[in-house]
Design a protein with these regions (language model features):
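A short alpha-helical cap/connector motif
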Residues: 1-230
Length: 230
């Protein structure tokens, strides 16, 4: 099994000494979320928490990815941020590929390829030929619908394409702790997908607890979602 992975806690997820709940109480996350959905980067919506912006900077500095693949584009703010941060850290010819079923991007950037595609059918747009040509290290960011089926489809698609040392980050499992009833519609999709995926493929992955717990236990919007390929 993966490091930290094994039995079911009270919330029904399959994870041992790594409960998904964060040290930050739900009502405080609610207030943080109010700011997250108003956050912009270079005049584009950039819905990342302050914790995750800082955690991503640690990961980018350590991993030095040459390619970032983002599933879920929105207005392209995070894709642009990743491209800029890779450039700032001296990456040679940084590349970002951002896939969305309904892209609404109004700009172009030579470092970024915006592709139209379904998280449940990524092989149609991220072909074997394309994946084999990617320059490593690779960082994958799963930020699509936050529903279980899409999250699980993304994890399953990338599993055979990841090399040792590559990362895949499953975003927004924190929806399970936000108190607005609207978030119940996600049915804890990201966390359930991470738990089930690690139950099947756990020998091949490690939860990077140094990133998850940089500011306290799972003080991130991506609890137990920072996964490193062994």
């Amino acid at each position: 099994m993966a490091k930290h992975v094994a039995e079911a806690p009270a919330d029904g997820h399959q994870l041992v000494d790594r409960p998904f709940r964060s040290d930050i109480p739900g009502p405080i996350f609610d207030r943080i979320q109010d700011g997250v959905v108003r956050t912009v980067y270079r005049n584009l919506a950039f819905w990342k928490s302050p914790f995750d912006i800082a955690i991503y900077l640690q990961l980018l500095s350590r991993l030095r990815p040459r390619t970032v693949i983002e599933i879920g584009t929105k207005a392209g703010g995070s894709a642009l941020w990743f491209a800029d941060m890779m450039t700032a850290q001296g990456a040679e010819s940084p590349a970002v590929i951002s896939v969305d079923i309904r892209p609404c991007v109004t700009f172009t950037d030579p470092r970024i390829a915006f592709l139209k595609g379904d998280a449940k059918a990524l092989a149609e747009v991220l072909t074997d030929q394309l994946m084999s040509q990617l320059v490593r290290p690779l960082l994958v960011v799963e930020d699509s619908s936050h529903m279980y089926t899409e999250c699980m489809s993304v994890l399953s698609f990338f599993h055979p394409h990841l090399s040792s040392g590559d990362y895949i980050v499953v975003e927004d499992g924190i929806v399970s702790q936000l108190t607005d009833p609207a978030y119940l519609n996600y049915k804890d999709g990201p966390n359930r997908a991470v738990a089930d995926f690690l139950a099947r493929q756990g020998d091949d992955y490690e939860i990077d607890s140094a990133l998850c717990d940089l500011y306290g236990h799972n003080v991130t919007y991506n609890p137990n979602g920072w996964l490193r390929r062994r």
